[in-house]
A protein has these predicted regions:
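Surface-exposed loop/turn segments and immediately adjacent short secondary-structure elements
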Residues: 1-117, 122, 126-130, 147, ...
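Residues that form ligand- and interface-recognition hot spots within folded domains
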Residues: 7, 85, 107, 127, ...
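Proline-centered turn/helix-capping motifs that create local helix->coil transitions or kinks
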Residues: 25, 93, 139, 143, ...
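Short coil/turn segments at secondary-structure boundaries
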Residues: 31-32, 116-118, 136-137, 196-199, ...
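Conserved short loop/turn motifs at secondary-structure junctions
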Residues: 35, 65-73, 151-158, 185-191
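Conserved catalytic palm subdomain of right-hand nucleotidyl-transferase polymerases, strongest
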Residues: 57-65, 113-123, 161-202
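Electropositive, glycine- and tryptophan-enriched low-complexity nucleic-acid-binding patches
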Residues: 132-133, 137-154
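Conserved polymerase palm-domain catalytic core
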Residues: 188-236
Length: 236
């Protein structure tokens, strides 16, 4: 049935996003006590780097603060953000306002009357983006040590061309030695939207315990706080 009333359309989008992003979270691994050592505080130089790395001309999150404001305020913005991030660092908890995001549906090819034919883009606070950029940089140096050499996606300095070269080499060797070779090309529907947070956290915990990840324990706890309490709403 086609929906024509604005309220009905909004309700349908709410139902769709709730189903798409529903979480059955368990094993929250609540930590006792606070970590007060092992990982250095957020530095102002990290904030400056993150601000310079973030793409401009992006829509604001729920707080309505544009990224360009940080560029205008420059050092004053760095000092304010540093004060906020230090508070997050001390409490090891992600701010409640930053746990809320707004989804904007962007139409793709196909029937525009189906919610599944839209790409949902999340609008989050620019201040939270800066903090996430810093946490990502800290975690990335450890993650890169654990990833296998065969993975090229989402890795700096590697890409599709590397994998194409590898595939051609494998095909040539298979032909040379007269061996059968099989390739699987998998396109997951809503791949990023359907990541299992429980499994993601389980993998991260295993890496933390088995490696020298104790040096970023506070980053882990803050990430854990964000992962288990994110809230979203859709704007149709």
């Amino acid at each position: 049935m086609d929906l024509t009333e604005a309220e009905d359309i909004k309700k349908r989008w709410q139902e769709y996003t709730e189903e798409l992003y529903k979480k059955d979270l368990h094993d929250q691994d609540n930590h006792d006590g606070m970590i007060t050592h092992l990982e250095p505080d957020i530095l102002e130089c990290e904030i400056k780097w993150a601000l310079e790395s973030i793409t401009t001309n992006k829509a604001s999150g729920g707080d309505g603060i544009p990224e360009e404001l940080f560029q205008i305020l420059k050092d004053d913005a760095v000092k304010v953000l540093h004060s906020v991030y230090q508070q997050i660092w001390k409490t090891q908890q992600w701010p409640q306002d930053w746990k809320r995001s707004v989804f904007i549906p962007i139409p793709k090819k196909g029937n525009a009357k189906k919610c599944s034919n839209y790409c949902t883009v999340a609008l989050i606070s620019h201040a939270s983006k800066v903090m996430l950029k810093i946490l990502q940089a800290r975690l990335q140096q450890y993650i890169n040590r654990e990833l296998p050499d065969v993975q090229a996606g989402f890795r700096k300095g590697r890409g599709t061309r590397d994998q194409i070269t590898n595939i051609r080499w494998i095909m040539e060797k298979a032909r040379e030695f007269k061996k059968n070779i099989y390739f699987w090309f998998i396109d997951y529907a809503k791949a990023f939207d359907c990541v299992d947070d429980n499994k993601l956290w389980k993998i991260l915990k295993r890496w933390e315990y088995q490696t020298t990840w104790s040096g970023i324990s506070i980053s882990f706890r803050i990430f854990h706080s964000l992962l288990w309490s994110t809230q979203s709403k859709a704007l149709a």
